């Protein structure tokens, strides 16, 4: 009996708290990606490029590029091009990116090109927010979509006006890093939580000694580290692999008002309640009636009189009981028993929370 109770208590503790590495819960402050952007031209399209008469910036960009190559286009020349498209190029400069390292780029059409499939991006400088060039992008574009048209009919799968170039940009300038400067580093929690921040600080202090870590707020833990890059790398690697018992998350229900999707975590519980959901539909039908005089020469006029009919219908509305549920599968089963659509479920959950029956935070995005 004692062994059974001990095993049961161990099972409950294991279920309530799950050990995770600090590296999965936090990130190092200052170690982040930086966005890059550039404007360029895609050539080699199979007649699916910009209509240059409607996108003058494409022609202007092409003239500037040709002039840099020593080719002069006579003034007033109306170039009817179909194989060129103006695009925006975006990329992310990774932390500690070094010269010569390659990164992926995303190419997106900004004109009226029909497709970028089969195109080649010409050399495009990628700049940061400080207007400095950090990378150069060039290469063949990979487009995931496909399309065909004939006889006025067309079929398209996925999107054709954007694509990627794997390893399509080369880093030319390194971003200065403050890593290794100073004797402290800040760890930032992925989700703010006072108890988790303090628990991580206590775990580091138990292993590295009291005073090694301090929880500054619900998201930031300050860690004292040895000076020097190599020493900080080893110290940080040891800290990130430490195990922390993760307490149960806050009960939360997330509702997407645009798509009607409802997502909830396993901490959501329901109290007993009764729910009545009625659907009210209003139909307005307007029809124009023409009234003409009976005698052709009686001096009457033809009059158009609108006739409007409004139909009001209400369905459902029966009161249904929802039992108290403490497990996620029971919560899902209880909500499915209502037979409500996702859009109806959003209003039901809001009403449940207002009545105190939904034990969770309700977040609408």
From Swiss-Prot:
Molecular function per GO: structural molecule activity
Compartments reported by the entry: Periplasm; Bacterial flagellum basal body
InterPro entries: Flag_FlgI (IPR001782)
GO cellular component, one term: outer membrane-bounded periplasmic space
Keywords: Bacterial flagellum, Periplasm, Signal
Keyword GTP-binding belongs to the record: no
Top-level taxonomic group: Bacteria
One BP annotation, GO: bacterial-type flagellum-dependent cell motility
Secretion signal span: 1-19
Predominant localisation class: periplasm
Any Pfam family hit: FlgI
Function: Assembles around the rod to form the L-ring and probably protects the motor/basal body from shearing forces during rotation.
Subunit-level organization: The basal body constitutes a major portion of the flagellar organelle and consists of four rings (L,P,S, and M) mounted on a central rod.
Similarity remark: Belongs to the FlgI family.
NCBIfam families reported for this sequence: PRK05303.1
Designated name of the protein: Flagellar P-ring protein
Lineage: Bacteria, Pseudomonadati, Pseudomonadota, Gammaproteobacteria, Enterobacterales
